[in-house]
């Protein structure tokens, strides 16, 4: 969705080269990291992963079964297997157990903290992300006040998110530093106190249901401790929260898609998506979420 064609082509070439060099027959799991324009291979495992059933559902092929037959000596050509690039978008959304453990911080790091995954599938990214959030038990708001507090290096990056949410009719509330950056960019923004600045503060606003969405990025041990109560209160109040800029922007696209209603958000059988892969022209895809709201 947000990776350009040249990088995707490079990923495909690297994958093919590694599979041939390592002599893997069957399934192979690769993990890539993209930093700017630099592509890194994190690991290669000659085995299946949890992504296999996700991919199988997304493209309508029994990937594990095909891999087993290939490992047993059959050839892909004889099985009639071809590469499928679906016109729809499938989003894998993690499910976290934070609500079951009192006092646990919801901030994410390099370690795995999810205990499950769900799929959202639609003709565009925003609708797919929205469906995935619903499946994970998260209901994105349609109107209200959004609280934003981001680290210094994210203050410019969050501006497209702010612009998109304001265009959708939301009001924006922020801590002083973030509010200054938002106002400097020409967007209206209300100021709310941090907890340490005295009441009424942001946690009071969350408890009073004055805020419907939280976007909070932070760095450093002290900043993480200071913002813990924000994340935890949002969780206990069942207020959607995102701890990355990309997550906030994805949420804005999802809300925009939900506003469109049917047919964008209408339930659709998985078999209908699979049937469309081999029948009829490929429909145009809406812009990826890094290209701005449409």
Functional labels for PLM-detected ranges:
Residues 1-142:
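ATP-dependent carboxylate activation and anion-phosphoryl transfer catalytic cores
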Residues 47, 152-153, 218-222:
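Short glycine-rich anion-binding loops that position phosphate/pyrophosphate groups of nucleotides
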Residues 134-146, 165-167, 205-211:
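Glycine-rich phosphate/diphosphate-binding loops that line cofactor/substrate pockets in enzymes
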Residues 147, 169-181:
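Short internal beta-strands
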Residues 161-167, 179, 183, 235:
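Surface-exposed amphipathic alpha-helices with a cationic face
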Residues 193-194, 202-294:
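Peripheral docking tails and interdomain loops at the edges
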């Amino acid at each position: 969705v947000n990776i350009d064609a040249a990088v995707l082509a490079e990923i495909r070439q690297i994958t093919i080269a590694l599979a041939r060099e390592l002599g893997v027959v069957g399934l192979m799991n690769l993990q890539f990291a993209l930093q700017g324009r630099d592509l890194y291979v994190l690991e290669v495992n000659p085995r299946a992963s949890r992504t296999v059933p996700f991919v199988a559902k997304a493209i309508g092929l029994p990937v594990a079964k095909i891999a087993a037959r290939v490992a047993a000596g059959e050839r892909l050509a004889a099985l009639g297997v071809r590469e499928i690039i679906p016109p729809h978008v499938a989003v894998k959304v993690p499910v976290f157990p934070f609500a079951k453990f009192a006092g646990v911080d919801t901030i994410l790091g390099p370690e795995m903290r999810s205990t499950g995954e769900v799929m959202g599938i639609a003709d565009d990214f925003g609708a797919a992300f929205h469906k995935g959030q619903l499946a994970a038990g998260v209901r994105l708001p349609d109107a209200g006040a959004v609280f934003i507090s981001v680290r210094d290096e994210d203050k410019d990056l969050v501006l497209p998110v702010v612009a998109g949410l304001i265009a959708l009719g939301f009001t924006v509330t922020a801590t002083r530093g973030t509010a200054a950056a938002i106002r400097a960019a020409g967007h209206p923004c209300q100021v709310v106190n941090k907890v340490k600045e005295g009441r009424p503060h942001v946690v009071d606003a969350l408890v009073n249901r004055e805020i419907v969405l939280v976007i909070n990025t932070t760095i450093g041990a002290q900043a993480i401790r200071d913002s813990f109560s924000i994340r935890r209160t949002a969780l206990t109040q069942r207020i959607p929260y995102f701890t990355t800029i990309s997550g906030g922007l994805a949420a804005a696209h999802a809300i925009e898609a939900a506003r469109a209603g049917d047919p964008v958000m209408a339930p659709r059988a998985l078999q209908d998506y699979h049937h469309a892969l081999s029948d009829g022209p490929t429909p145009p895809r809406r812009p990826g979420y890094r290209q701005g709201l449409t």
